[in-house]
Amino acid sequence: METNKPFLTVENITVRLRDQLFLKNSFWQIRSDQHWAILGPNGSGKSTLVRSLWGGVPLQSGRIVYDFASHQMEPQLIPQKDEIGYVSFELQQSLMEHEAFQEDLREYAGRTEEVTTARDVIFSGILANRTITPADEERFLKVVDHLGIQYLLQKSIGSLSTGEVRKTLIARALIKSPRLLILDEPFDGLDERSRATLAESINRLMTGPMRVILVVHRLEEIVLNITHVLLVKEGQLFMQGPKDEILTSENISRLYGFNLHLERTNRGFRVSYGSEKSDKIDTSVVYEESLQDVPEVLIEMKDTTVQYDDLIVLDRLNWSMRRGENWAILGTNGSGKSTIVKLILGDNLQGYANQVMLFGKRKGSGEILWEIKRHIGAVSSELQVQHRKKMSAYDVITSGFYDSIGLYRYPTPKQKKIVDGWIELLKIGDISNQPYHQLSYGQKRMILLARAMVKSPPLLIMDEPCHGLDISNRRRILRIIEMIGGTPTQLLYVTNHRDEIPNCITHVMRLHKGKVLSQGRKEDIL
């Protein structure tokens, strides 16, 4: 490849999303010796920009010139699908929704033994256009080895963790040997080891002819071989240029609107903003009722095992969460963290075949599911996927009083006051009246936290709560979690990031391949 010639040029584009214009008259050029990272706050337009590159959103004006295209074409046309690989949370969400629909069809047709495997998903991009060739099989083996995902090829896609599905989709994009690979938040949902492995894989990919665009929220995830950085703010291209010129404390502070310190390390960058004292929450404003009736033991699991055929997801788990304790669960992808959450929430039916006690009642003993859920607030990627109804963010928050997907009754004046209180605490008033489905991933996460808390739950489950959040919203949500830690609500906090464990956490459980490595008081485990 001839170095330093144009690879892709965004010429004065403007994008219309619903009734708003974004990226007005934006110009951006990628040259053939460059790899770019894109940074910006939640809802700033990062994903809109990269979606425009493959035709995911239409252009209002301007054009995109695909200098890398393998065939001559008109500038306004999109290259062949094989030439651009794209991975994002929205793509992952679409895949899981499609698989859930397929599972319903199989159950209706009595074909419950059929599954969609990770291998099927990886090859699906090719099968959409043509049959598989020996060259495809050879490339498949190389990609799978490159990403280290041999172990999950025959697993059902529905049984994989968020991080495992993400790696499967990256393999799906790579098997087509694209000229341009767009990775929108590829590290979200991955454990520490998987993040390091994927970063190494992306760095190796950058040594070949393929160019990479990496959209990230965490500066630590900008891999070493990135050469240039584009900053996006409030729907506009804010700053762009060589990595070392753009990534300074001053520029990043201007991007996010508060003082940040950027430090260079041998692995890239680290950003810090100092510690903050968390205020106390006025429970008289945002709590609907007293939590005096909470039993001594909130959760208890005895010899709990979850198994799919020969795959053991949880292996004889013994664990309890008592009154006054706030727990964090750590573990690698596929270790069983999310399975524990699903057992508690009633989303995994194997809970009824095990000794799982919630608030003093054993699952399967005649308890009413909605009565149990009334005591639990939850924030997770799975819950975020379920909210597909077109409704305002305010109504999504209000639906938390009724544990419903959708709002089917009018809230009382007292309930409205509580909703308004959480909106004020989370500082989400600017998005609370917007259509929920039009919000960015990170903005939706903030709405779901408010939804989880409005019913004053004795237990709040947070499965990767910082997933998809920029540094400003991560700081805000961690501060709010610390504040919640000082209320009657107890926390079950699931994360892949040890550095995001709040100070209010009192106990930690570490999992590996479905087994408990250690559990106990935080100071003894970490």
Spell out what each predicted region is:
Residues 123, 135-152, 398, 413-431:
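Conserved ABC ATPase "signature" region
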Residues 216-217, 495-496:
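H-loop/switch region of ABC-family ATPase nucleotide-binding domains
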Residues 227-242, 505-521:
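H-loop (His-switch) and adjacent beta-strand-loop-beta switch element
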Residues 156-160, 435-439:
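Conserved ABC ATPase signature
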Residues 181-185, 460-464:
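Catalytic Walker B motif of ABC-type/P-loop ATPase nucleotide-binding domains
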Residues 170, 449:
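Hydrophobic anchor residue at the start of the ABC signature
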Residues 50-127, 342-405:
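ABC ATPase nucleotide-binding domain signature region
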